[in-house]
Amino acid sequence: MMRFLKWFFLTLREWFLKPATHRSAIIVANETLSRFIFSTRHFGRQPLRVKADAYMPSQGQVSVFRVDGLIAAQIWKIGDEIAEERDRTLYARGDIKAREVGRSGLDILPAEPPARHANIVGWPENDKPRQKLIALQLAAVATLVPKE
C-alpha cells in the first residue's frame, strides 16, 4: 500500500509540475520501456542477454524510454539521437515491461524532455549490493534487441 501511495504521489507531482508530451503521464503495467545500451559491457552476445550493469542506477535513477506504439525504426531513431548527443555508439537496447520494474520495488516517473523519457527511481540509497540485486532481477526479465 505504501509503495502505491508513493508512486501515486510522485506521479501526480510530475503530472502537475510539467506538461507531458507523451500520450499519458501515467505509466501502465504492460507498457514497454527501452533502455538504450551504449557499452559492450552491458550486454552479452552468447547468449543474447542484457547484463545487470545496464540497469545500475546513476545518481539514483536509470533512464528509459516509453516505446509503446512505435515501430522499431522510430525506437532506434530515439536511441540514435541520444547517442549523437552523448557522442557514443548505440549497440543495443533492453526492453522490459513496466510491471517488472514495479515488482522490483521501484517506480517509474515520466521525465520529459526528451519526449517519451522516464526514469526508474526508488533505488536503495548507499546500498550497492541491493542495487545490484535489483539490477540483476531487471536484466533477467529484459529482452535484448541488438542494433542491426
What residues fall within each predicted segment?
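Conserved NAD+-utilizing ADP-ribose enzyme module
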Residues: 2-31, 41-48, 52-148
